[in-house]
Regions:
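Positively charged n-region of N-terminal signal peptides that target proteins for export
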Residues: 1-4
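Acidic-aromatic/histidine active-site loop/patch
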Residues: 100
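Functional-site microenvironments in short loops/helix caps that host divalent-cation chemistry
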Residues: 50, 54-59, 63-76, 114-310, ...
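Boundary at the C-terminal end of the N-terminal hydrophobic targeting segment
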Residues: 18-20
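Short, structured beta-strand segments at or near domain termini in extracellular proteins/domains
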Residues: 319-329
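Bacterial N-terminal signal peptides
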Residues: 7-15
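Mature N-terminal segment immediately following signal peptide/propeptide cleavage
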Residues: 35-51
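Short aromatic-glycine motifs in intrinsically disordered, low-complexity regions
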Residues: 26-39, 227-233
Length: 329
C-alpha cells in the first residue's frame, strides 16, 4: 500500500481512484458552538472510489476465524457486496473527530433538548455493567452516564439517530448552513481516504492499535471472564478514548476505526449495493434500521473494517455508538 503524507493528498474525480500530491494542507473549518466550544471540520475533495469489501464474504469469515479463533459465518458479510464504484460529486466538510460530550453538552444547554434516553415510554440506555448478566437498558444510563468514566473530550455515547438528527438541525439553524449526518457512501469514502485495504492502516487487524480504539488486549485483561474477539495488540484504552489520540488517515480524520460506532444518514438495505447509483448514493428510500459505521472500543476487529456495516433502530442508543457531522460546502 502506498503511503501518503497527511494533508498532501487530493482525490481526483477520474475513472477509479486517482491521486496527485499538493503542498497545500487540507482546508479546515472551526465551527463555534457557543461558550468557547469549537467543532473542527475538514474539507473532503470530490472523487470516486470502490465501495464495499474487496474480498469475498467467505474469505473475510475464513480470515478472522483462522486468525482469531472465531466461528463467524460468511452471511455476516454479505451486505458488503457487490463492491461497486461510487462517485462523490461535490466536496463536503466532515468532522475531524467524533462529536464529544462537551460539544453535545453545549447543544443540550443551548436548546434544552432531552434525548431519547431521558424521555418517552422507554427511558434509559445501555451502560457498562461489571456483571454481564446485568446488561440491558437501565434508566440510570444516558449520554451523561455510560457506566464508565468519560470527560468532555471523549466521544458522546448513548445517543440515538433521532438525537443526532436533532443536534444537526440545531446546528444548522444556529449557523445558517446545512449540517447533517454523512451518507454511508460519504463515510466510507472519507474513511478509506484512497486506500483499498481492510483498514486505512492496512490489511492486518493488529495495525488498528495505532489508528483506533477497538476490543484489544487491554479490554481482555480488564474483563477476563467475557468472551471478546480481540486483537492481540493493546491500544491503551479499556473504554472510550479521548478523541484524536490515534493516527489520522490521509484526509486528516481521526478515529474512523473504532472508539464509537458512527450513525449515518441512510436507511439500511442489505441488498442496496446491487442497485446503488454511481453518483452520490443516499441509501434506500425507506426502512426500519439506520446504518452505523466504523466499529467501537468494544467491537471485534472485523467490525472496524472500512467496508463493515451495522444497523440499529433510530431510537436505539448504546455505550458504543456516537456520531460525527457533515456539512454541505
Amino acid at each position: 500500500m502506498r503511503n501518503f503524507a497527511i494533508g498532501y493528498v487530493v482525490l481526483l474525480a477520474m475513472s477509479g481512484t486517482a491521486f496527485s500530491e499538493t503542498k497545500e494542507p487540507p482546508k479546515k473549518l472551526a465551527v463555534d458552538l457557543g461558550k468557547g466550544v469549537k467543532l473542527e471540520m475538514v474539507l473532503i475533495p470530490a472523487g470516486d472510489f470502490k465501495m464495499g469489501s474487496g474480498e469475498s464474504a467467505e474469505a473475510t469469515a475464513a480470515f478472522f476465524n483462522k486468525t482469531y479463533g472465531g466461528d463467524l459465518e460468511a452471511g455476516l458479510f454479505k451486505d458488503e457486496h457487490p463492491q461497486h464504484r461510487v462517485r462523490i460529486t461535490k466536496p463536503l466538510y466532515l468532522g475531524t473527530h467524533h462529536v464529544t460530550r462537551g460539544q453535545f453538552r453545549q447543544f443540550v444547554k443551548d436548546s434544552g433538548y432531552k434525548t431519547d434516553s431521558e424521555k418517552g415510554e422507554n427511558p434509559g440506555a445501555y451502560g457498562w455493567e461489571s456483571d454481564p448478566k446485568e446488561f440491558g437498558i437501565n434508566e440510570k444510563y444516558s449520554w451523561r452516564n455510560a457506566g464508565f468514566e468519560q470527560t468532555d473530550e471523549h466521544p458522546v455515547v448513548n445517543v440515538s439517530w433521532n438525537d443526532v438528527e436533532a443536534f444537526c438541525k440545531w446546528l444548522s439553524k444556529k449557523e445558517g448552513k446545512t449540517y447533517r449526518l454523512p451518507t454511508e457512501a460519504e463515510w466510507e469514502y472519507a474513511c478509506r481516504a484512497g486506500t483499498t485495504t481492510r483498514y486505512y492502516s492496512g490489511d492486518d487487524p493488529e495495525t488498528l492499535a495505532k489508528v483506533g480504539n477497538v476490543a484489544d488486549a487491554t479490554l481482555k485483561a480488564k474483563t477476563p471472564d467475557r468472551k471478546y474477539l480481540t486483537i492481540k495488540a493493546s491500544d491503551g484504552y479499556v473504554f472510550t478514548a479521548p478523541v484524536g489520540n490515534f493516527k489520522p488517515n490521509a484526509f486528516g480524520f481521526y478515529d474512523m476505526h473504532g472508539n464509537v460506532w458512527e450513525w449515518c444518514a441512510d436507511w439500511y438495505g442489505a441488498e442496496y449495493y446491487a442497485t446503488s447509483p454511481l453518483d452520490d448514493p443516499t441509501g434506500p428510500d425507506s426502512g426500519t434500521d439506520r446504518v452505523l459505521r466504523g466499529g467501537s472500543w468494544v467491537g471485534w476487529p472485523g467490525h472496524a473494517r472500512s467496508a463493515a456495516r451495522l444497523r440499529y433502530w433510530p431510537v436505539d442508543r448504546g455505550y458504543y455508538s456516537g456520531f460525527r457531522v457533515a456539512r454541505t460546502q
